[in-house]
Regions:
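Substrate-binding groove of N-acetylhexosamine-processing glycoside hydrolases
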Residues: 1-177
């Protein structure tokens, strides 16, 4: 079911080549709408699916296939956070922003799992469960960095450990292709 987005994109491109990146993006958005809603209109669920899709692109692609970057909008924010963390700078603003982003991705995964097309969810629930666990891990790890700033060892270690447990859970799912 999830592959229908790519099939829709390819069919549209083959039938009438895109004239701009904006047109390609519009077609891609419409494909996500159709896969989730069975029609071409936006919905809360199709927007959630589209947002999750931006962060779940397969990076193990053969060399002859154009590489699609994963989490393009998020990567620079994570790099900036990491660099500030290494240099001991204040992370309050970046931490808050990342927590909001991760909370939204978690909410998107939960919404899609609860209200998405049943055939689609049956096939991708592993990715959705993985996403929820990964976002829980990231939330805990970000909270651990608060403990670093506060010089609160218990907060660091409790949240670091919680983050590792969530991460371990996230990699426990069997993905069937």
């Amino acid at each position: 079911e999830a592959s229908k987005v790519a099939l829709f994109d390819m069919a549209q491109y083959g039938w009438k080549q895109w004239r701009s990146a904006q047109e390609a993006e519009q077609i891609n958005d419409t494909a996500f709408n159709y896969v989730v809603n069975g029609n071409f209109k936006d919905s809360e669920v199709s927007k959630a699916f589209r947002e999750l899709g931006k962060h779940m692109r397969n990076q193990n692609r053969p060399p002859h296939v154009t590489k699609l970057e994963e989490s393009v909008e998020l990567a620079p924010k994570l790099t900036a956070f990491y660099n500030k963390l290494k240099s001991g700078q204040n992370l309050d603003v970046e931490r808050k922003e990342l927590k909001e982003i991760f909370a939204q991705l978690k909410a998107d995964a939960i919404l899609l799992k609860e209200k998405g097309d049943k055939k689609l969810i049956h096939q991708i629930h592993y990715w959705l469960d993985n996403t929820v666990d990964q976002m829980n891990a990231l939330e805990a790890l970000l909270t651990a960095t608060e403990g670093l700033a506060e010089k609160n060892d218990a907060k660091v270690w409790d949240n670091y450990y919680a983050g590792l447990k969530h991460y371990d859970q996230s990699i426990s799912y069997a993905f069937f292709y």
